[in-house]
Amino acid sequence: MHIVVVGLSHRTAPVEVREKLSIPDQSITESLKALKAFSDVLEVSILSTCNRLEIYALVKDKNTGISSIKEFISEYSGIIFDDLNPHLFCFRQEEAVLHLMKVSAGLDSLVLGEGQILSQVKKMMRLGQENQSTGPILNRLLTQSVSTGKKVRSETNLGTGAVSISSAAVELAQLKIGQEKGFDNLVSLESENVLVVGAGRMSRLLITHLKSKGCHKLILLNRNIDRALNLAQDFPDLEIVCKGLNELEENISLSSLVFTSTASEEPIIDLTKIEKINLSNRLKFIDIGVPRNISNDVKQHEFVKSFDVDDLQEVVSRNQEFRQKIAKEAESLVEEERIIFLEWWASLEAVPVINKLRSDLELIRKEELQKALSRMGPDFSARERKVVEALTKGIINKILHTPVTKLRSPQSREERQVSLKIVEKLFSLVEEDKNN
């Protein structure tokens, strides 16, 4: 059996490719079923965020398993395999384990140390368990990866003051507005007419960061206006006007800065809509939706500047030098956790031998117990029989304790193989070749 991961991220694919591979929560169940239908895939879990799609699997054969996962990704995205393959990465065994732990710790994120990825890994684990697509191996790996992410954030300063996708989007707006005014620093958003489209988790974070950067009023649009109203109630000190998405064009015309973060699988704003709006001043779009909420063609409009998640790198790079130093400390913690998992996984090699040894000794125990009880005669009470049976079970457990502990203890593969051979030979757990 092999642990593998196949996927793509902001490091390997631009947003126009990633948006075709975004798997919404409502499609996860169907996707997991499709992956489990491959005969080589034993366990599988999907991580889908705005910056990555990664499929972790336990497979019988690593080559055919990886090919099956790639086939699924190509079919799901509708991208021809030869066009898709250059954007995909594949990690196997130790590298796959290390990659997931680094992802969970925020070490592979666009924003080093960002915290949202940890909750996304938790969700991946929950969805895998709910859909029964994960088993003992991936469940152990996911659980330990989540613990690793928590450990890195609690024992290092990597997560301290870390920006998120949402905060980076707000900083990008500050940077671009400042550059237009001839400044190289981040300016206040107090004078901007701000529109936020979408009322989900990312929009909540957007509003939180907008507030901290000087914004004191904004318009909030959502398809479900009740959800927008509920979100607005969490910001009583901000002036938030909530409206339906059907009023989008009208409110764009009143805005100078528009943030979009909806779950729409198609753009909600394109050049045709923009051309219908009488823009009296320049307009900036910051789109953090994946798939993108804003069509790329809006950039053709002379009064519009549009940015997506790939443009956040400009802001992120301003903060990375300090975080890179802290990341070294975090990587050493991740490596420790990787070794712990691999030692546990290697110890599973001993399970069949341990089970056979326990089974053989249990058979002997029952046979000898039955002989002894038959000699005791009818005067031997049921209570006394239970005491004797408990005694024999205790003896077996005591006998097994030391060899089982030794077989499961951390050791090299070569050492474990030698130990297993010795136990098998001493207890006749395998049939010897009669021809020898």
Swiss-Prot record:
Pfam families (alphabetical): GlutR_dimer (PF00745), GlutR_N (PF05201), Shikimate_DH (PF01488)
GO biological process: chlorophyll biosynthetic process; protoporphyrinogen IX biosynthetic process
EC number from the UniProt entry: 1.2.1.70
Active site: 50 (nucleophile)
Pathway where it operates: Porphyrin-containing compound metabolism; protoporphyrin-IX biosynthesis; 5-aminolevulinate from L-glutamyl-tRNA(Glu): step 1/2; Porphyrin-containing compound metabolism; chlorophyll biosynthesis
Residues of the site described as Important for activity: 99
Keyword terms: Chlorophyll biosynthesis, NADP, Oxidoreductase, Porphyrin biosynthesis
Role of this protein: Catalyzes the NADPH-dependent reduction of glutamyl-tRNA(Glu) to glutamate 1-semialdehyde (GSA).
Domain remarks in the Swiss-Prot or TrEMBL record: Possesses an unusual extended V-shaped dimeric structure with each monomer consisting of three distinct domains arranged along a curved 'spinal' alpha-helix. The N-terminal catalytic domain specifically recognizes the glutamate moiety of the substrate. The second domain is the NADPH-binding domain, and the third C-terminal domain is responsible for dimerization.
Protein name (database record): Glutamyl-tRNA reductase
Gene responsible for this protein: hemA
